Amino acid sequence: HLLQFRKMIKKMTGKEPVISYAFYGCYCGSGGRGKPKDATDRCCFVHDCCYEKVTGCKPKWDDYTYSWKNGDIVCGGDDPCKKEICECDRAAAICFRDNLKTYKKRYMAYPDILCSSKSEKC
């Protein structure tokens, strides 16, 4: 669920996700095309690909079960589809944290028109 994903990102990075990631680069937020602008944008590209592989549930809207253990996200629950969504979100939140040093403010609210090169395949 997008609100759960937001909480993961906030706790992992300390950044407000809606401001910092919702419109970052060519792939963060809704849709995506072209080549990812940097490592953070690539996190979003990989997250989009992860969501594409999920079948049987709605990644953006279905709630899943997770907890925090020693600063890490632990996905749980009995529903394999929802657990898969959680794992996609977990991986992206960790990716954002791991790439904070190369995060570039100039890619916030990046115009889609500048993402016109050929899109990569998942």
From Swiss-Prot:
Ca(2+) binds at Y27, G29, G31, D48. The active site is at H47, D89. CDD domains: PLA2c. Disulfide bonds join C26-C115, C28-C44, C43-C95, C49-C122, C50-C88, C57-C81, C75-C86. GO terms for molecular function: calcium ion binding; calcium-dependent phospholipase A2 activity; phospholipid binding; toxin activity. Its main location: secreted. Snake venom phospholipase A2 (PLA2) that inhibits neuromuscular transmission by blocking acetylcholine release from the nerve termini. PLA2 catalyzes the calcium-dependent hydrolysis of the 2-acyl groups in 3-sn-phosphoglycerides. Homodimer. Belongs to the phospholipase A2 family. Group II subfamily. D49 sub-subfamily. This is Basic phospholipase A2. It comes from Gloydius blomhoffii.
